[in-house]
Amino acid sequence: MIKIHSITGRIIIGKTIGFAIGIVAMLFLPLFNIPIMGMFGLGTLLMFVLMGTLTGFMGIFDRHPMIDFKMPWWFRGPLVGATFLLMYVLFTYEMMELIMQSSLVTWMGLKSPFWAILDGICIGGLMGFVETKLAGEGKDLPLS
């Protein structure tokens, strides 16, 4: 039996949030004439699930192991989210450029795909917050 207050609980919560956000992102792809089940759609889903997994694992580190400074959830989650979305934008720049040029996005005045990193910061922060509130944090968390 898996206890929710554990490392495994954090990972399950992160994967669930990542899966939900990935599915929602995939459902918006037809608005930009991008197939849902294409490489971009499935890569988007996989990226958010892996982001949830890593934010779950990062909950073990409430202090940096080498520099010894405090790393609360509001630092860890957005850092992981920004890193994942930066990698995502760098790998899918052309497709993200098409999305940013659509009429659904241009009215906001955002032209660069790198604005998506702000989404990663918000999503990573949400993942870190929910995982910490429901499953705890720190090196004393049980494995399962």
Predicted regions and their residues:
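Juxtamembrane/disordered regions of integral membrane proteins
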Residues: 1-144
